[in-house]
Amino acid sequence: MSQNFGRISQVIGAVIDVEFEPGKLPPIYNALRVTNPAIDDKEYNLVLEVAQHLGENSVRTIAMDSTDGLVRGQAALDTGKQISVPVGRKTLGRILNVIGEPVDEMGPVNAEKEYGIHRESPSFVDQSTKVEAFTTGIKVVDLLAPYARGGKIGLFGGAGVGKTVLIMELINNIAKQHGGFSVFAGVGERTREGNDLWMEMKESGVLDKAALVYGQMNEPPGARARVALSALSIAEYFRDEEGQNVLLFIDNIFRFTQAGSEVSALLGRIPSAVGYQPTLATEMGELQERITSTTKGSITSVQAIYVPADDLTDPAPATAFAHLDATTVLSRQIAELGIYPAVDPLDSTSRILDPQVIGEEHYAIARQVQYVLQKYKDLQDIIAILGMDELSEEDKLVVARARKIQRFLSQPFHVAEAFTGSPGKYVELKDTIKGFQEIVAGKHDDIPEQAFYMVGTIEEALEKAKKLAA
């Protein structure tokens, strides 16, 4: 088959129009290649993705890299297929970009197989109907806002409250306890953080269980709007071909929408509410519907969500919320108390905190813990004004238990061992339930609250109490 060439007819920022001979238009989502000497000296080094057909012989495309240095009349080669990325075990421990090229200077990936980045979501028949909890080994998550296998979790938090450390601990726990793989999509975030994550994962020994796909802030919007799809294709391979339970991290899902809105106007679409693209819900749905459990395996995704100007009604976060099964909210107030992970136990929610999914016992204890913490929160104003002495005996007991619960919700992480000096703990769900049940029931009212800080199970807290008393 002869190669199909077109010519660049106009360049507007990240959007490029290419003219082809009549009857030779490449289909939507096809990848075209152009030589851009401003990137490097390789031939056909710039990938364009067909987005629209304009009339009979012209297509409008989105560039996946810089368009500086392109000129009209340049040749564009139709590759005959969509953007595809290498998949399989060879991608583990590597950093790829949106078009599947390695950017870690460790040579080619040499994967046996490639997947296109636009794929159909699993059909109804293939989807798993079982709702089950996904144990993370992190007490506060497993007890109060459990993750569903194949579910989508929103991770909310400002700068410096521990989002990245929590993500790394989850990668570590799924690798060591479940033997599973993780895929990390860095979408429009800081390159420095992407670099730090790679270094830290290397140090903590989890890098060989994860594939990293980056399209960071400095990339053109085309790359940022597609990099989450590239990562998702890698995760889908592990789910569909290897039957794995994969963790997919997207940091940050807001940037995916933001990139879409940047190219939307250039593509000639009329903007919708707050200037976002009119196709916002469709684009989000196409991405999110591919993240699910099938009869073969599952993809559970944790998505960091930036909320612009703290406005939860902004169309971008509001569209993402519709897809979430659980939320993990990190709070600065809790981080200031030195309690890590700084998850807010009253603000975090989960769809599967339901006795029919997690069982009566777990549900009852989770609700009791929330009740005690909420009561303590309500009493804090009184304590601040009048002091502890003015409380009734019953309220004093609630406060004492709440403070123990608060401290027992902290735990040392494996990936932070180098900083904390205490070995990380993976806590089994039954131990988590047992520990909180005993605190709520008042079995440990005589033990000082500092014994509960930064331990794994309740037995460790009792050991620590003995050491403190000695």
Curated annotation (Swiss-Prot):
- Entry's Gene Ontology cellular component terms: plasma membrane; proton-transporting ATP synthase complex
Q: Could you tell me which Pfam families the record lists for this protein?
A: ATP-synt_ab, ATP-synt_ab_N, ATP-synt_VA_C
Q: Where is this protein localized, as stated in its record?
A: Cell inner membrane
Positions of ATP binding: G157, G158, A159, G160, V161, G162, K163, T164
Where is it mainly found? membrane
Enzyme nomenclature, EC number:
7.1.2.2
Topology in the lipid bilayer is annotated as:
Peripheral membrane protein
Chemical reaction(s) catalysed: ATP + H2O + 4 H(+)(in) = ADP + phosphate + 5 H(+)(out)
Q: Does the keyword Cytoplasm apply?
A: no
Keyword Cell inner membrane belongs to the record = yes
Q: What does this protein do?
A: Produces ATP from ADP in the presence of a proton gradient across the membrane. The catalytic sites are hosted primarily by the beta subunits.
Describe its partners and assembly state.
F-type ATPases have 2 components, CF(1) - the catalytic core - and CF(0) - the membrane proton channel. CF(1) has five subunits: alpha(3), beta(3), gamma(1), delta(1), epsilon(1). CF(0) has three main subunits: a(1), b(2) and c(9-12). The alpha and beta chains form an alternating ring which encloses part of the gamma chain. CF(1) is attached to CF(0) by a central stalk formed by the gamma and epsilon chains, while a peripheral stalk is formed by the delta and b chains.
Instruction: Please identify the protein, giving its name as recorded.
Output: ATP synthase subunit beta
